[in-house]
């Protein structure tokens, strides 16, 4: 049995080593004959000698290709000839491959990146883990005790525990008297003893839990320190463990033994909320182990008892690790056999990598050349690519019995229907596109279904249908009318109670449609109705003199005039058509004056007289046509009331009378009423007619309708939203009793798919199935068969239309075919065997086979320049704000929202010059993203959160290169700023404009003044001049030129030799507005000879003040200090701001007179500093007061300035933007003053600046970078941010030796990369200059690092990378030229983010087209299968991953937000699958909620619809606002977060609705819930963000099965029918695509998608999505949930489950639950200083830390929640601190937040609410009141 392989080098040549176990003995075999090679494809074979002559260098040795052999291979199914280039040593390949690829004769090189030892296994056909050897397993674990903040490996190892099949023991160097503890003298001896045990026991497999990243690296570190050689391996040459970097973590290899780290395997295999050893042990094996709290660790060294607890804890860790290892190792061994690589590699690989290694091995066997991995550009393209998703069926909720788990309705031809325009016809004669009479009136036929049927038909009142056809039945009680769909066959059983829905107008409507009059009669009626509404007949007699006859005559003029709206284009076309058809003329069409109306006129007498006659006899015309014309012109569809309304004035009551008579003749119900009002002293009346009820609307739509499509659509919408809840006999519907019989029938049966009008509030969840490997095989889906030319046979994928050649087996399908066959054979063996061990091993094997077959985040700080002002913003909030404010300008491009901007600039890096630049931001960008995100932390404390496809910058060979988020790892070097460029200028503060942003109450007593001298009458004169310029003054004032000269100085006008020219009209308009306010509000103050105006009177116009004028004004309080309006920012003002931001205070308080007093105080203990503060303050604000430790500036203007510029509290203080606009001396002055207040010299000789504000900490770093200070570190301690500076500043030199930070060093790896030789350590810039100047370094290469010495960037090293899942928006800026910007905590340069993960983007055999095709076929076959089993075998499918929806949705199309019915998105049928129709959408997004409850936009790739065949409920929000949803549709309720609930489960709960302005959501409780009758379409959309990915050409998804039952049938019948169905459906499914019978379950319930539980015939419970293990759940919650599951599934008693919950709730409320069941265990996952949010466990941990108790990451805090008020975190104590005499736990918390949430996710499926589960009827004002009842 091969355990592993590697290679060593002897005499410069590689020797393969094979680590094996044979006949129970370990051995190492050597093979010195295997040579490394790559393949090269050449344009010209004659160049091979040149290629062989190419030279490279490896460790100082010249290397070249040693041989070249021409070989025949296949590449993507095509024959190719390539050269096999053979090398002497594996390391020669990277030394030469780049040069070979660059040769002009080389097209490309292949297989150059396959590691040598792995290549050996592939080429030799060797399979690790094959054989029957029994492997010895041993697990170990260490316990350490190091202080928080200490470096890794500094603290001592306390204990080492180990476990194997024989024993579990602990080694320690403390005296502990326990039988399983071995005590040695010290830590060094303990490690030596452990090494001895490993060598004695000689395990083949050494198991750890996170041993790669903790136990082994820590052990290695301590062994090095103590001088112990860790001889853990079996390799005599290299017996010590070796640490390898693997992605963003580490991996430790022990040669000769398999180091099996469980952690990555568990993370890949099972889904848990937390992956602590305790949680995994309990979830996988159902066992628990002891927990050790932080307080006990602290007391370890104090008591022997504590040491015993630690020893037990350590021993149990080792035992749990061993037992888990035994569980998981066999599956990984099977996977290793399948893949053909070692367990060490396989167990640490992602699914994508596993598939790739498998394909590489098969490719070699088939002589197939492997494609290369994508380069950077191709990788980005793949990341941006998306494709259409799979199919899902909504689960049928509730408890079901006798469920079969399978992996993977109609009328006879003479059934009558009414077709619009035809009347009654046979259903067999209906055509697609016809309109037939449906429940909503006329409904368009989208699809006619036809099937051959032989069997029983059910006859219900003459309606014949197949047994499974559904008929709506109405039942009534005192409270509501309920409409339920019942199967036709159920009517025979007598169980159906109620009435069926009919229409008494069936014959009448049919007659109308059949006996419609001629077109002429219809046109006459429509014209008459139009003129009745908005037309006029005008006759005018005019007297004139007829000169030819010499006498007076009378001229009779006739005119017909119709007025319509300019936008009523369809009505205009109809009127013109009518005049043409009836009279053969085209009337005149003109715009009516300046209105938006059109006037249609004709002056022909004959036409006039004919129309006059029509109007006289209007009541005898064809009533529907008259009404259609009248209502088109005079009626509106009221969208609020969902009614049709006609309104006529006082003198037109007769028109309403005519309309009413016509409606009566058709039987259309209506209401009439009058509205009286007074206008111009005259009483007037409005006469109103309204069609209100659903029956009236449907009759109007059916018999009359509108002319225009817009009004018809509005009417359809009104019908859709009208109520069906109180269904009773009315003008359209009739409730009838029924009679039923049955008869035999053989022939064709038909069904219709109609357009309907359901709506749905955005919660589209699409999950997916993975029968896809079979599809790949069946349809030969592979990159080498895609669109292959010259084939005879193709399979074409539905929906997407890609063609796949069937003439030869594709590479991937042929491999998958073998895998599928292999798995099927294994599963057959599993079913046949009764040996439990063999069954388990076979299961491991089939699971291994199945595994194969199958930008910037929002809270990052961003410095930008907006409208000329430097601002620090959170990137997400900033971009969201802009996109919200400019919605109409947002474009959507490839799932990305883009907003082009022109007033924003970013701080950017020129990658060529390495200089900081300020660059224009071209666009703001945001993407929707779901996937991995990375928190990257640098040694300097800088942090940034980025997506996997977002890039930072690093240095490679002296050049700036991008490094992706997923590639960043600990130790990498990242570029950060050394110097940031600013727009330095003379900075001034316009005080009036600055304080104009404050509330009016803050500036109520502020005035502005200007001296009278020289300004007498100036303001009035200027206003008159301005009015004259604007043409509003008839006479020019005498002193006009004086004002004109002034306006020229201000730049508004230009004087010409004669006259003037206005150069800035807009500016002049604003200037005039200012002067209008000044003239109106200016007052003369004689005491001071000044003009005065109250600031608030001109506040909204102060921005119009020209600076030249403003310089002559002062601003201040009426009786207090006033200062110049324009304040020049010099070094002194910079110091004032620095003093204030660091240790200043600004406050306002009531004084003794009842008014307000304002002051700004600057604090310091140093008298010299106080003196400087005083001098500066008096310079700007006049007299001040000096106290013992502060300078008090009692001036309101100082307060307003400080508040506006810097903020007033320590937490919101900020550096004002004006500092960043100022010159460098001003910035230094600010920094110096800030350092005086909040700076000090740290004991480590570093300078330190402190602040409580995260914003201010980032601003300080930015300020320092702007001054060229780069040796910076950022820390966070006790709520305070610390910015450490490790270099001298101009105002402070410590003259002491300091450790150099990374930004002031050149890392040795950079030096080695540039100079090609070893460097012992990093070197300082000074040392580098010294070496360069002395000639010790190559001057040419020195220039490559010039940017570090003289550029604007430095390097910082990655300290930590933490990966997590993220869903939501990610953000970008498009920056002109550079496409990068400064961002993140502490600020670093970042590039654009590319996101999205559809397919495995680094795959060699990647193909988007294959992915889309496989998914399309998947949808097709799943829907077909479900349709067949339901309709032909009578099953009810309970769960198969699906989605329905039926509400109005809010969409964004092409960047524009719209409120539309979902049906309006369905514009065409792009493809059909079964009875479902699909319309592909472009640039459409739906509004939905993310997991954080935030409104976000998600892409909608398609909309789907099908006929509703289930109950529909109407949920009333208000009396007029409701939503209709199907019975199994999920709504989202706000309860302990966001939860799914069905319509009948939401009573008493809050739904989530959008605010009117879409600014957020609000919570609303439904008014009523009622069942309605509905027979239209239901619609579905996919919302992007589903879990799917394409890995190396193979689609990996979840379940490919579904659960089904036949209600009421016996188990044996169901099993039999299920197997019959399998035989039937598999004969219809192609190729390998077969459905399997996976099992039978006695009982099960289905809560929601991916959430169900079933129990099999052996009593085994299987759950999905109903986790009973959660980190922050107490034992009582987990125990209660488990009991509820057993009661429902094992005992078939939901009632018992409810009683269990009630009993537990009562026991908790009465304090009868043992304390240990209430303990909540939570883990500390990071340093306490990093926690921003303080949860209960963090609160306790911080209390322990305050007592001197050390709490490290990984510590479990076990706590109890106490009764009381206030935050939970203030009411928690450790279990050990609980005193029953003093403390009471909080029953309310444990009931509401623990037990009920744990069980409600199950019991809600059965209609139970929270209130139903309490042992008392309700809870009024808290638990105390409840208990006292």
UniProtKB/Swiss-Prot annotation:
Reaction(s) catalysed (UniProt annotation): DNA(n) + a 2'-deoxyribonucleoside 5'-triphosphate = DNA(n+1) + diphosphate
Q: What is its EC number?
A: 2.7.7.7
Post-translational modification comment from the UniProt entry: This protein undergoes a protein self splicing that involves a post-translational excision of the three intervening regions (inteins) followed by peptide ligation.
Q: Which UniProt keywords apply?
A: Autocatalytic cleavage, DNA replication, DNA-binding, DNA-directed DNA polymerase, Endonuclease, Hydrolase, Nuclease, Nucleotidyltransferase, Protein splicing, Repeat, Transferase
One biological process term from GO is: intein-mediated protein splicing
The GO terms describing molecular function are: DNA binding; DNA-directed DNA polymerase activity; endonuclease activity; nucleotide binding
User: Repeat as a keyword?
Assistant: yes
InterPro entries in the cross-refs: DNA-dir_DNA_pol_B (IPR006172), DNA-dir_DNA_pol_B_exonuc (IPR006133), DNA-dir_DNA_pol_B_multi_dom (IPR006134), DNA/RNA_pol_sf (IPR043502), DNA_pol_B_thumb (IPR042087), DNA_pol_palm_dom_sf (IPR023211), DNA_pol_type-B (IPR050240), Hint_dom_C (IPR003586)
Say if the entry is tagged with keyword Transferase: yes
All copies of domain DOD-type homing endonuclease, residue ranges: 527-668, 1136-1269
Q: Which Pfam families match?
A: DNA_pol_B, DNA_pol_B_exo1, Intein_splicing, LAGLIDADG_3, PI-TkoII_IV
Query: What does the sequence similarity comment in the record state about its family?
Result: Belongs to the DNA polymerase type-B family.
How is this protein named in the record?
Answer: DNA polymerase
Identify the coding gene: pol
